[in-house]
Structure formats: structure tokens, C-alpha cells
Amino acid sequence: MAIERTFSMIKPDATKRNLTGAITKMLEDAGLRVVASKRVWMSRREAEGFYAVHKDRPFFGELVEGMTSGPTVVQVLEGEGAILKNREIMGATNPANADEGTIRKVHALSIGENSVHGSDAPETAAQEIKYWFSDTEVVG
């Protein structure tokens, strides 16, 4: 499997509970390396832009409200098969369906407050990384 990069986000429901370190440790323990990281407080415009793919979905307003309710940690992760590995360690979107030991099973509060986001494909990883980071901020 090839070394690749993916985008990862620790959402406000997790940062408010001081889980940034615990979640990052789970990612690193899974063999992923953080090559860029910053803490941001998303504006409404940033949240709407980042989640534009969901703009016509019924949960969009609630999603934007949640993402602008507190600080978020955005990261670029690197490793073998990083996209799939990150998705596996995050667990199912609904924490009730997540496997034991995954981030969402351990830390998520609900399907809406599920603690993390991760890219689902190489194309979205590239777009999401570019949305939050300049080339000089990603240091492998």
C-alpha cells in the first residue's frame, strides 16, 4: 500500500471536552503521522463552504451550527493507506454502529456530535487539505 495523505478534523464536541490529545494518540497509535495541525474556530462562511456538498440535506443547518460552536482541530495525516486507515479508526458515522475501540465508539456523543471527520477518497482528501492548509504548512 502506498504512503498517502488524508484530512482529519477533531470537531467542537470533542475539543470542548479536551479530547484533542486522546484522539490524536489513537490516530498515531494506528500508524498515522500528523504532518500539519492547527486549531481554528470556523466562521459560518468557512463551515458552509467546507460542507457545501451537504447544503441541500436536512441536517445542513444543524451541522453548520455545531461546527461553528467551538474550536476545531484540522490535521493532515500521513501513512500507508492513510485514507482507509483513518476511516477505520474513526468508526461508523453513527457511534451506535461503530466498532469497539474506534474514536466514535469511545468519544462520540451522538450521530450529530460524532467527534471527528475524515476524507473518504483521494480527491476529497486533496480538496479538504487545500481548504485549510497552504503547501508550506504541510511538512512531512
Swiss-Prot record:
Which residues of the sequence carry a binding annotation for ATP?
11, 59, 87, 93, 104, 114
Its Enzyme Commission number? 2.7.4.6
Q: Does the keyword Transcription regulation apply?
A: no
Q: Which PROSITE patterns match?
A: NDPK (PS00469), NDPK_LIKE (PS51374)
The cofactors required by this protein are: Mg(2+)
| Single biological process term from Gene Ontology | UTP biosynthetic process
User: What's a single GO MF annotation on this record?
Assistant: ATP binding
- Major location category of this protein: cytoplasm
Cite the active-site annotation: 117
Spell out the subcellular localization from the entry: Cytoplasm
Q: Which NCBIfam families match?
A: PRK00668.1
| Family of the protein in this entry | Belongs to the NDK family.
**Primary role:** Major role in the synthesis of nucleoside triphosphates other than ATP. The ATP gamma phosphate is transferred to the NDP beta phosphate via a ping-pong mechanism, using a phosphorylated active-site intermediate.
Summary of subunit composition and partner proteins: Homotetramer.
Recorded protein name is Nucleoside diphosphate kinase
Q: Which organism is it from?
A: Rhizobium leguminosarum bv. trifolii (strain WSM2304)
